Amino acid sequence: DQAINITNRIADIEKCDALLVTIPAQSLRTVTISLSDIVPASVPLVIATQGIERGSLMLMSEVMQSIVPPTPYAILSGPNFAREIAEGKPAASVIASHHPQLADAVSFAIGGKYFRLYSNDDPIGTQVGGALKNVLAIAAGIVEGTRLGENARAALITRGIAEIARFAKAKGGREETLMGLAGLGDITLSCTSTRSRNYALGVALGRAGNPQKMDGGRAG
């Protein structure tokens, strides 16, 4: 897509309209520190990285905001497998920001006929859903791998959503955000599809009975 320019030139950051962040969660702090003197405060951040930082327990926006100058940011999250988007198959996602103009600009830039973006103003709840769904997906995979049945998996997912919603509220987000694409949608995809790496890891764990017995599957 011409709306997204991929470059390995650090200097290009100073000229971009917005910076799309896709760095792995546990590497985000190190990379952000290395770029902290380069990223202008005028360049908005679009954070697509999902996760919670080990140790600090910070969300990705919190990690970046603790390092770079204060700048508008948006969170891109939803039930999306990158391969299907690349193949032009229909998909929807969430762009969450306290800055409506930024959310609209991102939607216009990367949305399209087959990729629909819905905006909300709850970046905290959106991030919590995207991060904790990974834990729930592993647990759902374990239920499948140990053959505990569909009833057990449905119960696990339902109670897991309720717990994630409470966590989101405790972090300052809104529980209802978890009923949308960045919560229920992402959880449904990740907890039911063998193409989900976390679900596949859980299945492998359940079948092996012990992490030490795993033969190295699709964890990640």
Where are the regions that the model predicts?
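Short, conserved active-site loop motifs that form the nucleotide-linked donor/cofactor pocket
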Residues: 2-5, 115
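Rossmann-like NAD(P)(H) cofactor-binding subdomain of soluble oxidoreductases
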Residues: 5-90, 106-108
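N-terminal loops that bind phosphate or other acidic moieties
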Residues: 20, 91, 152, 218-219
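NAD(P)-dependent Rossmann-like dehydrogenase/reductase catalytic/cofactor-binding core
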Residues: 133, 140-144, 169-179, 183-220
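Internal alpha-helical scaffold of NAD(P)-dependent oxidoreductase catalytic cores
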Residues: 38, 63-71, 90-177
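Glycine-rich beta-alpha junction loops
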Residues: 50-52, 77-81, 99, 121-125, ...
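A general structural signal for well-ordered alpha-helical segments in protein cores
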Residues: 28, 60-61, 103, 135, ...
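Short, glycine- and charge-enriched coil/turn segments that flank and shape catalytic ligand pockets
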Residues: 36, 40-42, 71, 100-101, ...
